[in-house]
Amino acid sequence: MSSEKLRLKVLEVVQETGDAHSIVFEKPSGVSYKPGQFLTLRLPHVDGPVARCYSLSSSPYTDDHLKVTVKRVKDGRGSNWVCDEVLQGHELDVLAPSGTFTPKSLDTDLLLLAGGSGITPVMSIVKSSLAKGTGRMLLVYANRDEQSVIFHQELREMVAEHPYRLVVLHWLETVQGLPSRKPLQEIVRPWAHAEAFICGPAPFMDCAADALKELGVSRDRIHVERFTSLEGDPWTEVEAVAPEPGGKTVDLVVELDGETHELDWPADQKLLDFLLDKGLDAPYSCRQGDCSACACKLLEGEVTMLNNNVLEKEDLAEGWILACQSLPVSDVVKVSYDA
């Protein structure tokens, strides 16, 4: 996990489907990531640079380079530029990998539900589990038609190589109609014990999550990744609000990258700003509450968030908070980026 700003060279551009491209970046030494995480790219635009988060479809266990896969969005300011303009040899500004849409263990059974470009982080998880894990996987992959299926051949080859560990079921709108709750339930019922990961268009994710909840799958085993467009520019220095001299502080314990830090946290300074001021390499991207790059888990105490456009009520119930928007409420707070 890192907020490090990188300048990455494009090694290859692969056209996956008529409206989806993969961008393969050179991977600098020292950069690591987990399956299911994303990169934040800085892209030019007539109205000024825009930042977009694109999931990694590469695996840290099987791929030497970083690869993101981008599908065109109608009138999308970022996706269309990537698909039309990025060429081999270009260099782009990128924030180091981050995100929490990643399995705690690759040895557990996984239920993967993807729609359209939602296959991107799921592909990273599939490849990683097959390479380093022992768990079995069911992937339900929904698309408009067969021509829209990203990674069609690669998925077919992985199933052929690992028939007892990976099952892939395609749901095509032109054949079966839009995914609906009851048919999905019947498909995934035998996998209700597994850790579930859902990514795709909002209606698909809501349908899939509702189907799992009605089957009795506990919320802590349902992981959802929502694609959002960022409004700010993470490369622009944000003027953090300095704490009032002599103001109230609270006892803060932070678990980050395997280390524990005990600090006096000013009550009027946001958690992320404070950690960065202290020289800690806490992850972040938008700094506006619009993405989950800075998410950490509240283990003890209470905070208030000034803005939250990404965490759902179930996430909040589990203790997830956005460090970029959190102020302390209780006198003692403990958070973990490693949970």
Predicted regions mapped to residue ranges:
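FNR/FR-type flavoprotein reductase catalytic core
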Residues: 80-244, 248-253, 260
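Ferredoxin-reductase
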Residues: 2-91, 108-109, 143-145, 156-159, ...
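Short, surface-exposed secondary-structure boundary micro-motifs
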Residues: 44, 97-98, 338
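C-terminal accessory/binding modules appended to enzymatic or scaffolding proteins
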Residues: 247-287
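Iron-sulfur (Fe-S) cluster-binding segments and ferredoxin-like electron-carrier domains
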Residues: 274-283, 293-339
